[in-house]
Amino acid sequence: MSFILSFWMIFLIDSVIVLLSFVCFVCVWICVLLLSTVLFVTKINNIYCTWDFVSSKFVDTYWFVIGVMFIMCLLLRLCLLLYFGCLNFVSFDLCKVVGFQWYWVYFLFGETTIFSNLILESDYLVGDMRLLQCNHVLTLLSLVIYKLWVSAVDVIHSFTLASLGIKVDCIPGRCNEIILFASNNATIYGQCSELCGVLHGFMPIVICFI
């Protein structure tokens, strides 16, 4: 489901950042250790000498084990993300999304047709976001599982809702499917993420969950 996918995506990114920070810290620590063994002079039996650091089984073992643990953690999170992305949940209702140049058409509950176009700047109200406001908003219920069928008529579009972790291509003659779910009331904004013509940047998506 969408909110699960977005949660695991954020969790994966956070894990990568933490692991990369730890790897950078260990690399800096090893470099400082090697540099100190070469530059610092030690007095042994009244003879000044430097440490000759050639190899260390401890460092090799430590680096190998930690690296394997990092890879396993990332693989586990990637497998969970792939698993939730392939799950087929029982949906409450079906919503069809069709992309045109350059607007969206939603077919909801098998009978309602919504044409969603970008509104003119002269019609903006206070607080409206530029290039993200539509004349008709798709209104859905929160805590309800919807199945989206997305397609296109003329060229390839991309139905993208970044905050829900959704990005699916709308291809003419092909119907792609994705599960849509929101855990709370919210207004979700998105745009077409595929170069579909001169007005590609003027195809906003607005979904209001109530």
UniProtKB/Swiss-Prot annotation:
One of its GO terms (molecular function) is cytochrome-c oxidase activity. Residues 1-15, 85-210 are mitochondrial intermembrane. It is found in: Mitochondrion inner membrane. Pfam families: COX2 (PF00116). It comes from the Eukaryota. Gene3D superfamilies: 1.10.287.90, Cupredoxins - blue copper proteins (2.60.40.420). Cu cation A1 binds at residues 157, 192, 196, 203. Residues 37-63 are mitochondrial matrix. Cu cation A2 binds at residues 192, 194, 196, 200. Mg(2+) binds at residue 194. Its cofactor is Cu cation. The keyword Transcription does not apply. Its EC number is 7.1.1.9. GO terms for cellular component: mitochondrial inner membrane. Component of the cytochrome c oxidase (complex IV, CIV), a multisubunit enzyme composed of a catalytic core of 3 subunits and several supernumerary subunits. The complex exists as a monomer or a dimer and forms supercomplexes (SCs) in the inner mitochondrial membrane with ubiquinol-cytochrome c oxidoreductase (cytochrome b-c1 complex, complex III, CIII). Component of the cytochrome c oxidase, the last enzyme in the mitochondrial electron transport chain which drives oxidative phosphorylation. The respiratory chain contains 3 multisubunit complexes succinate dehydrogenase (complex II, CII), ubiquinol-cytochrome c oxidoreductase (cytochrome b-c1 complex, complex III, CIII) and cytochrome c oxidase (complex IV, CIV), that cooperate to transfer electrons derived from NADH and succinate to molecular oxygen, creating an electrochemical gradient over the inner membrane that drives transmembrane transport and the ATP synthase. This is Cytochrome c oxidase subunit 2. It comes from Trypanosoma cruzi. The lineage of its organism: Eukaryota, Discoba, Euglenozoa, Kinetoplastea, Metakinetoplastina. The gene is COXII.
